[in-house]
Amino acid sequence: MKVSTAALAVLLCTMALWNEVFSAPYGADTPTACCFSYGRQIPRKFIADYFETSSLCSQPGVIFLTKRNRQICADPKETWVQEYITELELNA
């Protein structure tokens, strides 16, 4: 009985520590989303929102969020990307 109680205590402590390790937030310098390639233009009516990638990413990018919760990377230098961003900002 004592062995199983001790084993249970060790197991519970291990699980608690494991949970803390994997639920900890990333450091402030860890980018959350980066674009490694750019997608093609999609119709504006499918776009719900956007955000810019971190400056720590290897290349600049804009990530458009579609109404179906998909993410599409785009080149921020493209004219259509800038137009979509302007429209989204005006309608916010």
From Swiss-Prot:
Chief site of localization: secreted
Any one Gene Ontology molecular-function term assigned to this protein's record: identical protein binding
Disulfide bonds: 34-57, 35-73
Annotated compartments: Secreted
Signal peptide, first to last residue: 1-23
Entries under Pfam families matching the protein: IL8 (PF00048)
Entry keywords, A to Z: Chemotaxis, Cytokine, Disulfide bond, Heparin-binding, Inflammatory response, Secreted, Signal
Keyword Ubl conjugation: no
Induction: By lipopolysaccharide (LPS).
GO BP terms in the entry: antimicrobial humoral immune response mediated by antimicrobial peptide; astrocyte cell migration; calcium ion transport; calcium-mediated signaling; cell activation; cell chemotaxis; cell-cell signaling; cellular response to interleukin-1
GO cellular component, one term: cytosol
Subunit structure: Self-associates. Also heterodimer of MIP-1-alpha(4-69) and MIP-1-beta(3-69). Interacts with CCR1.
Function in brief: Monokine with inflammatory and chemokinetic properties. Binds to CCR1, CCR4 and CCR5. One of the major HIV-suppressive factors produced by CD8+ T-cells. Recombinant MIP-1-alpha induces a dose-dependent inhibition of different strains of HIV-1, HIV-2, and simian immunodeficiency virus (SIV).
Stated family: Belongs to the intercrine beta (chemokine CC) family.
Record-given protein name: C-C motif chemokine 3
Protein's gene: Ccl3
